[in-house]
Amino acid sequence: MRSLLSFVLLALARIAISEETKSCIDIEKGFKEEFNAHKQPVCICADNGIFSTVKGFTIECESASIASVSENLASLNGTELGRLTIRDSTVNVLPQDLFENVFAKQVKLERCGLSTLQPNSFQSLGGSAELLSLRENRIKKLEKGLFTGLKSLKTLDLAMNKIQEIDVGAFEELKKVEELLLNENDIRVLKTGTFDGMKNLKKLTLQNCNLEIIQKGAFRGLNSLEQLILSNNNLENIDWTIFSALKNLRVLDLGSNKISNVEMKSFPKLEKLVLNNNTIDSMKSIKLKDLPSLVVALFDRNKIESIGDMDMFGLTRSDRIETLSLARNNLSQISPKAFQHTPNLITLLLQYNQIEELSSHSPSQVRTPFLASLKKLVTLQLSSNNLSVIRSDELPKSLSSLALDHNVISKIEARALEGMEIKRLYLHSNKLNYLYQGTFDSFSPKSVEAVDVSLNPWVCVCNDPKEWLPRWLEASEEADVAEGALGCLAIPNCGQKEGSTVMPEEEEVYRSGWITVAATILTIVTIVIMVIIAMLYFKDARYQFPLRGRRSDSDLHKLIENDPLNIASDSILVVPAMPKRNTGPKKTVRFQNF
């Protein structure tokens, strides 16, 4: 009862004080006239302005002793602040009265060497602080009662400390906190009940913490948790039931650990599952079931060698899944019906594997394209595999972006891309000598956004009008994003159709000739005009000789200065441009080494 009365009295006192309007000038008058290590005032004030997300004044105190900072903050007398930042000060133990006169929505105490927190250190911030940042300090342990009184806090940032141990109940009073950042610490074990009381927590970040063990019940009570980031740790053998209570979980990131087996069941709201850069060697080791909201699944940078017909059966109910990544594995075998359980895929990433063809062979040697069931696929990444042939029935007709670069492709069948509205096509760094006429007929050169066919051993017959690819690339203009040599495809007019009257080079020479003639005529006319003006000038000067007296040197100097023909030697004669000839459709000529 006494503590409640004290809180009410303190609140009333602050309200009474805040009625008196202050400015940064008024606030800084109360600060001590001393300077920090950079010869600047210990604390300065700034107004956040009308466009800031944080209303009120900002106080910044940098590179000074905590005693000096404390003396300056004492003068605030409860003035309402938007943000208080204390940075690069020296403090090992946080004084309990440091924030006694502070009333701020955001409080940051960063890079101060802080190692010890005392109970109730932040109690005076309870009625105002919504964000508390203690990142980049040296805190080693979080004890129970440290955060007592922070009843309005929504974000707690403890990243980049040296935290090794968290007492059970350390966060139990942070009932309104929605985001907790603990990344880049040294928390090897998460104990049962570590996050008790955080019923409104929505995002928990624990990446890069050397985490090895998560005890059962560590996440109990986190009924509102939506994002759990556990990447870049040393997790190996996980009891997957530790996540079972997280029914509102939308994102689970377990990337860059040592996980070899996965078992995720009954997460009705899970949208993104990240398991990249682990030690999974088989899709059979990934058991997924009842994930109806799953949209993105990332399994890249593992050791998966094959995908069987039933390996992804658990995703049958995940009819919202759009993106699947298996890049940078050791994939060489994909069964004919491997993707039949994920027919709604839009993006499939298979680059940097050992795939040799896009079809599988049954025991009876019947060839079956394994991408045939993906009728909605828009983006397919197959870069850096061992593909040698692309057949006419192997690619989904829905494709818009196709990457086949850095393979050993020597043949693409004439109808392989038929019916596709390709926007981005990458065929560079293969072994293509030619493409059948009509290969690109389904998409016009004007409609593509990017195409690259460079670094192939192209063979061209430039005097043959049937040599279509050079003309197609020329028509694509800026969409041709070739990063390497195009070989004979870059020869000007290669494959040019007969009947063209003026080649681009001839047209340029023709146009340049007319410009030269026009410039010569204008030069001669100008010289004639200058001669006539000079003659008139001397004729006029002859009638001035009978005048008495002589011009002074200054008169002669003035005469020369005012002479309209006194043109500097480096003057530029501007020749009017000749009218443009009607040359028909615009032609683009590309000059490249070949």
UniProtKB/Swiss-Prot annotation:
Segments in the Cytoplasmic topological domain: 535-594
Tissues expressing this chain: Highly expressed in the pharynx and at lower levels in the intestine, but not detected in other tissues. Other studies suggest a broader expression pattern in somatic tissues: from embryogenesis to adult stages, expressed strongly in body wall muscle, vulva, somatic gonad and pharynx, at lower levels in the nerve ring, hypodermis, and rectal epithelia, and very weakly in the intestine.
GO cellular component, one term: P granule
One function term, GO molecular function aspect: DEAD/H-box RNA helicase binding
Subcellular location per the Swiss-Prot or TrEMBL entry: Cytoplasm; Apical cell membrane
Protein name listed in UniProt: P-granule-associated novel protein 1
Sequence intervals crossing the membrane: 514-534
Quaternary structure, from the entry: Interacts with glh-1. Interacts (via LRR regions) with myrf-1 (via C-terminus); the interaction promotes the role of myrf-1 in the synaptic remodeling of DD GABAergic motor neurons at the cell membrane.
Residues on Extracellular side: 19-513
InterPro entries: Leu-rich_rpt, Leu-rich_rpt_typical-subtyp, LRR_dom_sf
UniProt entry tagged with the keyword Membrane: yes
Biological process, per Gene Ontology: germ cell development; molting cycle, collagen and cuticulin-based cuticle
Null mutant phenotype: Larval lethal. Animals developmentally arrest prior to the first larval molt and subsequent growth is slow, although larvae survive for up to 8 days at 20 degrees Celsius. Animals also display uncoordinated locomotion, a shortened cuticle, pharyngeal defects, stunted gonad development, and abnormal vulval morphogenesis. Heterozygous worms have reduced brood sizes. Knockout in DD GABAergic motor neurons results in defective synaptic remodeling of DD GABAergic motor neurons.
PROSITE patterns from the UniProt entry: LRR
Topology in membrane: Single-pass type I membrane protein
Main location, first listed in the record: cytoplasm
Protein species of origin: Caenorhabditis elegans
Keywords, in A-Z order: Cell membrane, Cytoplasm, Developmental protein, Leucine-rich repeat, Membrane, Repeat, Signal, Transmembrane, Transmembrane helix
Signal peptide: 1-18
LRR repeat residue numbers: 78-101, 103-124, 125-149, 150-173, 175-197, 198-221, 222-245, 246-269, 271-290, 291-315, 318-341, 343-365, 374-397, 399-419, 420-442
Function: Regulates diverse developmental processes including larval molting and gonad maturation.
